[in-house]
A protein has these predicted regions:
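Active-site-adjacent structural elements that line small-molecule/cofactor binding pockets in enzymes
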Residues: 1-97
Length: 97
C-alpha cells in the first residue's frame, strides 16, 4: 500500500535532506462500549476522508478507496463538503476506524 508512493517521493527528495524518517500515528481507546469508542474517532476520520484537500486531490479519500471503500469515501466527502459534518461522521464504516 505504501511502498510505491514512498519510493516515488524518495526519488524526488533532495539527497541533502538526509534519510527519510517515517512517523506513524494511531488512535488508541480502551473501554467496553466499542460503538462509543468508534464514535470518538469518527469526526477525525470524516475530516480527513471528506475534507482534507480538494475533491479531486485528497490523499486520505484516495487511501480509503484503495482500502476497498470507494462508495463510503465518496459519500463521506460529498456530505463533508456540503457542510453536513455529522452525517459524514455517521457514514464512516466501523471497519475504517
Amino acid at each position: 500500500m505504501w511502498g510505491e508512493p514512498l519510493a516515488a517521493g524518495r526519488a524526488r527528495r533532495d539527497p541533502g535532506l538526509g534519510p527519510l524518517d517515517l512517523h506513524v500515528g494511531v488512535s488508541v481507546a480502551i473501554g467496553d462500549d466499542v460503538g462509543h469508542l468508534h464514535d470518538l474517532d469518527r469526526p477525525n476520520r470524516a475530516l480527513y476522508i471528506g475534507g482534507m484537500g480538494a475533491r479531486d486531490r485528497n490523499f486520505y479519500n484516495d487511501l480509503a478507496r484503495r482500502f476497498g471503500y470507494p462508495e463510503a469515501a465518496g459519500t463521506i466527502q460529498d456530505l463533508y463538503l456540503a457542510g453536513r459534518k455529522a452525517e459524514a461522521e455517521a457514514a464512516v464504516p466501523a471497519d475504517l476506524l
